[in-house]
Amino acid sequence: MQALIFDVDGTLADTETAHLQAFNAAFAEVGLDWHWDAPLYTRLLKVAGGKERLMHYWRMVDPEEARGCKVKETIDAVHAIKTRHYAERVGAGGLPLRPGIARLIAEAGEAGLPLAIATTTTPANLDALLQAHLGADWRGRFAAICDAGTTAIKKPAPDVYLAVLERLGLEAGDCLAIEDSGNGLRAARAAGIPTVVTPTTFSAQDSFEGALLVLPHLGDPAEPMPQHVPGAAHRWADLAALRAWHHGTLIEAT
């Protein structure tokens, strides 16, 4: 394993509730009579990208109006307001990194293992989350960062992962991806990257066929995984465990 690639929303932090709240705050601010609850948002998450999600919903509830000439302008405006609300929520605290994330980032830095990000979230959302947890110089911790501005086609297409591989200068089999959703898993696997999945409540019912492992989270000494996982010396995933799982995948593939 020569690099570790992280998704962001749902993987680094359980962000989807904050995104949902931000969408609803934006709807209220612009006077839209929309309100998304958790079950609806779970379904909408099958559509990657906030603007794409807004367009998909608009076509669901009012297909005629969704063909209007100012739809794109409206979606851009609503999404910008939603992004502001999300950043405010992240900046206020209360949105911790998931178990194991901060520890693994630190371990990788100490070991000289390159880290990368492959996400369909916006640069603004990405910066808000990681600056809050890793500081203003967070980008220096990652060898490659690809987000919604990198590729036009979003997950489950593999484009963002292929872009990361190109920037890293590595083959797919040299890397390990950490994802939380079915869309993310399909994107990583379509790029040929072995993938560990840590679902959230919003993605728990997705299909994870093809995943190397599906874990509740990556664990920490203070918050271990519920049970021991073969290949891990502890009830948390350290770099040694990730390397063992990755190595097992390569052995099976030969």
UniProtKB/Swiss-Prot annotation:
<dbReference type="GO" id="GO:0016787">
    <property type="term" value="F:hydrolase activity"/>
</dbReference>
<dbReference type="InterPro" id="IPR006439">
    <property type="entry name" value="HAD-SF_hydro_IA"/>
</dbReference>
<dbReference type="InterPro" id="IPR023214">
    <property type="entry name" value="HAD_sf"/>
</dbReference>
<protein>
    <recommendedName>
        <fullName>Protein CbbY, plasmid</fullName>
    </recommendedName>
</protein>
<dbReference type="InterPro" id="IPR044999">
    <property type="entry name" value="CbbY-like"/>
</dbReference>
<dbReference type="InterPro" id="IPR023198">
    <property type="entry name" value="PGP-like_dom2"/>
</dbReference>
<dbReference type="InterPro" id="IPR036412">
    <property type="entry name" value="HAD-like_sf"/>
</dbReference>
<comment type="similarity">
    <text>Belongs to the HAD-like hydrolase superfamily. CbbY/CbbZ/Gph/YieH family.</text>
</comment>
<dbReference type="Pfam" id="PF00702">
    <property type="entry name" value="Hydrolase"/>
</dbReference>
<keyword id="KW-0614">Plasmid</keyword>
